[in-house]
Amino acid sequence: MKNLQRPSGMPAHKYTPYHQNFPFDMSDRTWPDKVATTAPRWCAVDLRDGNQALIDPMDSERKLRMFQLLVGMGYKEIEVGFPSASQTDFDFVRTLVEGGHIPEDVSIQVLTQSREHLIERTYEAIDGAPNAIVHLYNSTSTLQRRVVFHQDMDGIVDIALTGARLCRKYEEQLSGTAVTYEYSPESYTGTELEFAARICNEVAETFEIGNGRKMIVNLPATVEMATPNVYADSIEWMGRHLYQREDIILSLHPHNDRGTGVAAAELGYLAGADRIEGCLFGNGERTGNVDLVTLGLNLLTQGVDPQIDFSDIEEIRRTVEYCNQLPVPERSPYGGDLVFTAFSGSHQDAIKKGFEAMERDAEQQGVGVDELEWAVPYLPIDPKDVGRSYEAVIRVNSQSGKGGVAYLLKSEYGIDLPRRAQIEFSGVVQKFTETSGSEVSAQQLWTIFRDEYLPSRDGSGSTWGHYRITSISTHAEDQANTVLEIGLDVGGEHKERTAQGTGPIDALINLFNREGMDVRLLDYTEHTLSASANAQAASYVELAVGDRVLWGAGMDSNTTRASLKAVISAVNRAVRDAQEAAQD
């Protein structure tokens, strides 16, 4: 097949490929052969990097709520602000410290630039915290060296080392706070690797790491500039060129400018990183920081404990939306409204069969479904594991098929339609959705089913139906024959009839045939709607009425009445369709 695409006219000449600006050789890379088997150290930066990107930054109440959420989920390193940059951030850090909100096993992280008055203010903010990470940064990229700082490499290194020395100076003034240092060569992805390694090594030397004293070297994709494999290559390269690697916690801070922040973080972790910074649901500057929810639950789907509790994703999402005043997109992995929802008919059918297979396997093995390996098509994770119900898994619109319709009726109302009845009813539903142009809820689905198969005369639904049972009595004439005495409302006229057959259903069909109809039983099935002693029975019959084949359904606390109602349901549908055809 010939490719018919044509040049777009987009100004590609304005942009230089990343490898031309920052060439390096990693032909001996090892990360592609590695697999993640444990969770990284996590650092949530929602209260700093995430907060600074909000249209309306969080007030103190929302900040505290976010902090409490992160602590409750299990994050042990939480960046809480840039206390030297604003009074609001400073006051919040002091609220955390003085209010006793910081657990002993949680380290708060604060950001600072390499200026003495800013560093001094930073240490004033954290004084008294049990554990603190002082995060020093300065930009190292070729672009910012040229257009922002007008500095050469030596000048940029001097900025970083001056900041490191000042941090050590003010650390001496703290009372009871254990400090860990973090250094970020900001805009790392726009920095030559040799220079990034040089400045990180010199900062590490200034911080005097070793002998039990570790530091964090954070390598931010401040702007995502290349494919994730290139970022991973750079992380493995840096790991080989940091002099005291055993005393360094190598950290990632991916942004999502190219839409591959999660992939960059996952590959960078395989490439030797120890730690990942990000935000819940990917909040952050421009296109956001890497999404900690996606990263954590991706690990869970591979059988790796993320060491973060995502078991109530709805509450996590509600809190994040409240604090950020931004909605979580409906398609956001794991947390969005629609991520466990199937509209496609083939998807719905596969999901339904997957659930049924899990239930069968559990019964055969004598264990609970939760003890089995999760294996349901189109659902990479059990929604229940993150606190979601199965109610929203299948939703019905014009693209839906029998599987989705059948699943909702069974899961919500206990109606277990036979396969051919599923096919017939899905056609009824599709006609409705194509006319309405909208999605059908489970409650609407029940209404459509009731009005099609269970016409009511109590005002709760449609009132059509040529035949309606008013009374039933059966007795066995002999072992082979049953006598049915039935009262029928026929088009508004009451009639009493008696018929015989091998059973009640056969007797009623014989009655219709005796009165000039052509009715034959093709299939019959029944089940109870619940396990309680007073449960109703649901019966389904497939009848040939003349040249039509239709299903009927009946429900009653008495199984005989339910089966006869199902016959009446199918005959009524045949009569209705014949009358509508005659009118056309």
From Swiss-Prot:
SMART domains with a match to the protein in the record: LeuA_dimer (SM00917)
Regulatory domain: annotated span: 456-584
Keywords: Amino-acid biosynthesis, Branched-chain amino acid biosynthesis, Cytoplasm, Leucine biosynthesis, Magnesium, Metal-binding, Transferase
Pathway linked to the protein: Amino-acid biosynthesis; L-leucine biosynthesis; L-leucine from 3-methyl-2-oxobutanoate: step 1/4
Cofactor dependency: Mg(2+)
Gene Ontology CC annotation, any one: cytoplasm
Pfam families for this protein: HMGL-like (PF00682), IPMS_D2 (PF22615), LeuA_dimer (PF08502)
Gene Ontology biological process terms, A to Z: L-leucine biosynthetic process
Keyword DNA-binding in record: no
Protein family (similarity comment): Belongs to the alpha-IPM synthase/homocitrate synthase family. LeuA type 2 subfamily.
UniProt-recorded name of the protein: 2-isopropylmalate synthase
Organism: Kocuria rhizophila (strain ATCC 9341 / DSM 348 / NBRC 103217 / DC2201)
Gene: leuA
